[in-house]
């Protein structure tokens, strides 16, 4: 912890279940670099911590921006927090930052909520003098986030939706493959999004030996120090911890099948937590109604 008060200064709903909050956290803002994340505890009485990548930071104002999707109990609690309220804790910045240097051509692929952590990385490569192509994927146009911010600096911007309601009707791997096949192909690809998307982005880039592929993994975390082992992943023949060794890894070395299996194992637990939370909310609403 670092003494910041973690007050929510702004709250914006980007789509049906995606929110952006600006939090007062001067110490985190001063130290944050692209690719790093924080562990957030919403309620002191409910101690679960969740990893959220820092989407933006303003060291002068002492603020950080977090973009998250309402999928489980903690993110639901966070989505309900009003402006002016405080989070219990924001631990960070954690993880190894992205190694930003001037590259010939970088293609950054963001899928769904993964667009948020991809944004500062793509922007940093642009500011370093790299040519940057941005590919964004979403199920439909209502779920596209941060498009104006990305278009502002991208040398090439490609939007894909599953239903064709905006941009191309395609998966992100389709334009990614086309770009890799160009004569002026990228020397680096960065993919951030659902694990299955990153797996197939890696498979798309893998045949092109002269193109690096980096992925940013988002796994279960508890302490952020590697002691709990909840975030362990197999990278090549070794066990690594996302919180201290990542979150970025060479996509070609990630054991995607074992990681996906571990993530699936936690879903029934998260569903039960959400069901309990909904029951408590309904009971509280019923009690308030009876007191009227």
Language-model-detected regions and their locations in the chain:
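Ferredoxin-reductase
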Residues: 2-85
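Short, Lys/Arg- and Gly-enriched loop/turn segments at beta-strand edges
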Residues: 46-54, 94-101, 243
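FNR/FR-type flavoprotein reductase catalytic core
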Residues: 73-222
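Local cysteine-cluster metal-coordination motifs and their immediate loop/turn environment
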Residues: 117, 195-196, 218-248, 277-281
């Amino acid at each position: 912890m670092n003494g910041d008060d973690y007050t929510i200064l702004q709250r914006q709903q980007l789509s049906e279940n995606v929110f952006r909050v600006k939090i007062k956290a001067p110490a985190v803002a001063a130290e944050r670099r692209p690719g790093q994340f924080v562990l957030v505890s919403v309620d002191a009485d409910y101690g679960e911590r969740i990893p959220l990548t820092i989407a933006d930071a303003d060291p002068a104002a002492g603020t950080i921006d977090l973009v998250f999707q309402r999928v489980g109990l903690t993110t639901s609690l966070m989505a309900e927090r009003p402006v002016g309220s405080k989070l219990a804790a924001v631990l960070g910045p954690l993880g190894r930052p992205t190694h930003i240097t001037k590259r010939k051509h970088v293609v950054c692929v963001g899928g769904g909520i993964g667009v948020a952590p991809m944004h500062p990385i793509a922007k940093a490569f642009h500011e370093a003098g790299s040519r940057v192509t941005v590919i964004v994927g979403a199920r439909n146009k209502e779920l596209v986030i941060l498009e104006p911010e990305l278009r502002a600096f991208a040398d090439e911007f490609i939007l894909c939706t599953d239903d064709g309601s905006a941009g191309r009707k395609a998966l992100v791997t389709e334009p990614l493959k086309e770009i890799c096949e160009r004569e002026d192909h990228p020397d680096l690809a960065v993919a951030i999004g659902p694990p299955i998307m990153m797996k197939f982005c890696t498979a798309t880039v893998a045949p092109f030996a002269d193109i690096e592929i980096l992925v940013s993994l988002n796994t279960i975390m508890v302490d952020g120090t590697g002691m709990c082992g909840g975030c362990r992943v197999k990278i090549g023949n070794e066990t690594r911890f996302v919180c201290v060794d990542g979150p970025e890894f060479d996509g070609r070395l990630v054991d995607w099948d074992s990681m996906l299996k571990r993530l699936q194992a936690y879903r029934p637990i998260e569903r039960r937590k959400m069901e309990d939370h909904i029951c408590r909310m309904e009971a509280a609403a019923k009690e308030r109604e009876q007191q009227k």
